[in-house]
Amino acid sequence: MIGVRVVIALVMLLSAACTPSEAQPFTPVDLSDTSPVETSSRVPARPSPQDSARSAAPREEKVGVAPGVRVVVEWPAAPDADTTAMIEVLRDYFAGAFRAVVSEGRDTGYLDVVEYDAVDDASSWVGAFLDERRSVRGTARLYALNVSAVSGSGDDRGAQLDVCVDESKMRLLDSSTGKPVARQPDWTRKPFLQSAAMGRAADGGWRIRLFRHAKLPDERAKGCLR
């Protein structure tokens, strides 16, 4: 789902988040209960390796897009309120963009979470699928979500949200037949790093203003290998 683009410098991303350039897409852990312990001189039980592994594991959120299409988000363990809001925006964008593709452009909800140049970028991405009579099926996975930088404060605050995207479980389809095309694109094989510059909209909510990505063998994208 991605073409060959170059990730711009961080300063440019942050400045774009605070003021109004090329889009490319292509989603707290529960601790196990313990038995009550008397509050006398007992030493608190030490967590088992299994408990530690569970507490370190990301929480998965599965978002249904359409029959046979979904976005899975691996949430960080304890995001603050702003990080949570930004992740929700990026999740809604990915799910919404795929929903626009499978609905043949009828669903335009993805445009609710973008502004400035990101509007044209997102519209062009969806339009390319429609023009070529292409659709998708499968699962896109978003992981290693991280706010890598912030600038400004209050209503003027901007931020860069990085996310690793794995679409290897997706297939590009011929929308007229519903069957996978013979030549599958690179994004169905290798993960890539997506960066979204975000800023506060007039209603106080976060919006995506700029997209950039890094694809393998770029050093930044290597962090998405696992």
Question: Predicted regions: what is each one?
Answer:
Residues 105-223:
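Structured, amphipathic secondary-structure segments that form assembly/contact surfaces
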Residues 1-16:
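Sec-dependent bacterial lipoprotein signal peptides
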Residues 59-140:
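Core segments of small alpha/beta cavity-forming domains
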Residues 27-49:
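Post-signal peptide N-terminal segment of mature Sec-exported envelope proteins
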Residues 17-22:
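Bacterial signal peptide processing site
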Residues 41-65, 75:
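Post-signal-peptide N-terminal segment of Sec-exported extracytoplasmic proteins
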